[in-house]
Curated annotation (Swiss-Prot):
Catalytic activity annotation: NAD(+) + (deoxyribonucleotide)n-3'-hydroxyl + 5'-phospho-(deoxyribonucleotide)m = (deoxyribonucleotide)n+m + AMP + beta-nicotinamide D-nucleotide
Organism lineage: Bacteria, Pseudomonadati, Pseudomonadota, Gammaproteobacteria, Alteromonadales
Species per Swiss-Prot/TrEMBL record: Shewanella sediminis (strain HAW-EB3)
Cofactor(s) the protein requires to work: Mg(2+); Mn(2+)
Keyword match Membrane: no
Ranges that cross the membrane: none
Xref: PROSITE patterns: BRCT, DNA_LIGASE_N2
Protein name: DNA ligase
InterPro entries found in the cross-reference section: BRCT_dom (IPR001357), BRCT_dom_sf (IPR036420), DisA/LigA_HHH (IPR041663), DNA_ligase (IPR001679), DNA_ligase_CS (IPR033136), DNAligase_adenylation (IPR013839), DNAligase_N (IPR013840), NA-bd_OB-fold (IPR012340)
Residues noted as binding NAD(+) in the record, renumbered to the chain: 32-36, 81-82, 111, 134, 171, 290, 314
Length: 670
């Protein structure tokens, strides 16, 4: 029995250490298979010896008996809210108030304002005891069993320098990937979708059945200490130092926390986080700015229900209510018919929005939306604005159903919807003017043939004036014909014709991407080019051959097979080749020459000796995958001049970093 007890103790300790490395350090220390082997062994031992199960065992996060209701908990110390500022002028006023009341220039601790649910977690002698929601600030709901299921929250504190009684405050969030997965599962079951990750986190945390909470992949970030007893316990003299103490005790703390010594640094931090907002793993709605010195915090005190020493600098709102005035139907380059909501203009996400996507007929039905409804519009970063919900109680009696068209609104061809697909498509192909325009815009775009000066308006005029009907027609244009376009003189026309001529020299990958085959993006086009080497092999391939290509699944293989089986598509391809579009032959590369195969690289900053696209292509030619963001799976970051947050994150994760000269050495095989 003693040996079993020791093994359980050892497994619990080892697994908790692995959890810490994974959730707090973001640096997994063992493969998933090894972790699964260890935890399965622990589950087996605990099942056979339940009396030996330890309170901090990672197996105790699966959820327990469902509750009838939530009990109330009175907070040992009120959980206050923060005042907000919405502009630089308002922040300047906050800074002036702080400076006037402190004896020295304050240093601020800045961190992302997480958009989740605030919770209080209590530990006694280093062991998890209870958790509560913020509630009204004085009284919250007892969510002890639900919080226990969150893997990133320690059930037993690390180290030994923690106080006998410790209250930790932080935000429970649902990571974006977990939110997408949750809604995908709900959609597959025909269940109601969550509007945003915050609602999903709140709904998951308030489940009476903690097993449901355990299934929701919630996360947690600590942002403050609450009650500490004894009060004389030695703690950091600054907020940032206290956050680092929390991290040492096993709590996740945002890697974006930063000390800022003056107004400019704070504003730069705000601008940087706002710019990178969409790349973060979690939703945020601003930054929290706190006076770092605990002494100064005590000196400044509180006003009403908020501290004087902190504020939330909010981002422009991402969701607003407005009126749905009508619906138009747009046709894309692949024939997809998309309903677009015409809205009463509303300022959201930093811009005025008057149109938003409704995605497809299924989404219209799911929302239950009608023309005349008051709707909630969301705009996040560069994402196209979308209608995410209706305000049912504001629906007027005159609201009208939205009728999806049976024929194309542009060419009057039949609209068809393939079984199993959400998107309805016009069957007109290049006969459809809308598809023709979008197809040629795509073909001439920067990532395809990169025709310099061939903007959307030029393409639209070329088609409207019947100068171009297919991509190959671009290469037959003359300068005199181009002068028929608005604001196009002979000099500009000659320059554009020269740019079109230059675009004939391309790469096989760019050519394939430019064809606009459904779901064939840049990376897939490059993989297809590297696999087949030439056009004839590609055109004669079947689905079984396509599926052998990296990143090509059954659906993309089906799209490729269908595309090259259509005579009119083959005619488009052949006409382009006959018009003079060509590319260098791709030589067979020996396996041993793919020195970076299986590696993930990221480029950041400005490269001065090498074009970024060339660098990307050369890395891919050596077998590397070139990603857009740094993660624990990144093998190497190339940092050019003025490298920013990606470099910082790579250094935090211990990712190998090369400068441009280092990259050139790798490409040269040194």
């Amino acid at each position: 029995m003693h040996a079993i007890q020791e093994e359980i103790k050892q497994l619990t300790s080892v697994l908790n250490e692995h959890n810490y490395r994974y959730y707090v350090d973001d640096a997994p220390s063992v493969p998933d298979a090894e972790y699964d082997r260890l935890i399965n062994r622990l589950k087996q031992l605990e099942a056979e010896n339940p009396e030996l199960c330890l309170p901090d065992s990672p197996t105790q996060r699966v959820g327990g008996v469902a509750l009838a209701k939530f009990n109330q908990i009175t907070h040992l110390k009120p959980m206050l809210s923060l005042d907000n500022v919405f502009s630089e002028d308002e922040f300047d006023a906050f800074y002036k108030r702080i400076s006037d009341k402190t004896s020295e220039t304050p240093t601020f601790c800045c961190e992302p304002k997480l958009d989740g649910l605030a919770v209080s977690i209590l530990y006694r002698d280093g062991v998890y005891e209870r958790a509560a929601t913020r509630g009204d600030g004085s009284v919250g709901e007892d969510i002890t069993e639900n919080v226990r299921t969150i893997r990133s929250i320690p059930l037993k504190l690390r180290g030994s320098d923690f106080p006998p009684l410790l209250e930790v405050r932080g935000e429970v969030i649902m990571p974006k990937k977990a939110f997408d997965s949750l809604n995908d599962r709900a959609r597959a079951k025909g269940e109601k979708l969550f509007v945003n990750p915050r609602n999903a986190a709140a709904g998951s945390l308030r489940q009476l059945d903690s097993k449901i909470t355990a299934s929701r992949a919630l996360g947690f970030y600590a942002y403050a200490l609450g009650v500490v007893e004894p009060e004389s316990w030695p703690l950091g003299k600054g907020h940032h130092e206290q956050l680092m103490q929390l991290k040492s005790w096993g709590f996740p703390v945002s890697s974006e926390v930063k000390l800022c010594g003056d107004v400019k640094t704070v504003l730069d931090y705000y601008a940087d986080i706002l710019e990178r907002r969409e790349a973060l793993d979690y939703e945020i709605d601003g930054v929290v700015i706190k006076v770092d010195s605990i002494e100064h915090q005590l000196q400044l005190g509180f006003v009403a229900k908020a501290p004087r020493w902190a504020t939330a600098f909010k981002f422009p709102a991402q969701e607003e209510m407005t009126l749905l005035e009508g619906v138009d139907f747009q046709v894309g380059r692949t024939g997809a018919v998309t309903p677009v909501a015409r809205l009463k203009p509303v300022f959201v996400g930093g811009v005025t929005v008057s149109n938003a996507t409704l995605h497809n007929a299924d989404e219209i039905a799911r929302l239950g939306v009608k023309v005349g409804d008051t709707v909630i519009v969301r705009r996040a970063g560069d994402v196209i604005p979308q209608v995410v919900a209706i305000v049912a109680e504001k629906r007027p009696v005159s609201a009208n159903d939205i009728l999806f068209p049976q024929t194309c609104p542009v060419c009057d061809s039949m609209v068809e919807r393939t079984e199993g697909e959400a998107v309805a498509r016009c069957t007109g192909g290049l006969f459809c003017e809308a598809q023709r325009k979008e197809a040629i815009k795509h073909f001439a775009s920067r990532k395809a043939l990169n025709v310099d000066g061939m903007g959307d308006k030029v393409v639209e005029q070329l088609i409207d004036k019947e100068l171009v009907a297919s991509p190959a027609d671009l290469f037959r244009l003359t300068a005199s014909a181009m002068t028929m376009l608005d604001r196009m003189g002979m000099k500009s026309a000659t320059k554009l014709v020269a740019a079109i001529e230059d675009a004939k020299q391309t790469t096989f990958a760019r050519f394939l991407y430019g064809l606009g085959i459904r779901e064939v993006g840049e990376a897939t086009a490059a993989n297809l080019a590297n696999y087949f080497k030439n056009l004839d092999k590609l055109k004669s391939a079947d689905a079984d051959e396509f599926i052998k290509v990296d990143d090509v699944g059954a659906i993309v293989a089906q799209h490729l097979t269908y595309f090259f089986a259509q005579p009119h598509n083959l005619e488009v391809v052949d006409n382009l080749v006959q018009a003079g579009v060509h590319w260098p032959e791709i030589e067979e590369v020996a396996e041993e020459a793919l020195s970076l195969k299986g590696q993930t690289w990221v480029l950041t900053g400005t490269l001065t000796k090498l074009n970024r696209n060339d660098a990307k292509a050369q890395l891919q030619a050596l077998g590397a995958k070139v990603a857009g963001s740094v993660s624990k799976n990144t093998d190497c970051l190339v940092a050019g001049e003025a490298a920013g947050s990606k470099l910082t994150k790579a250094q935090d994760l211990g990712v190998k970093v090369l400068d441009e000269d280092g990259l050139l050495a790798v490409l040269a095989g040194e």
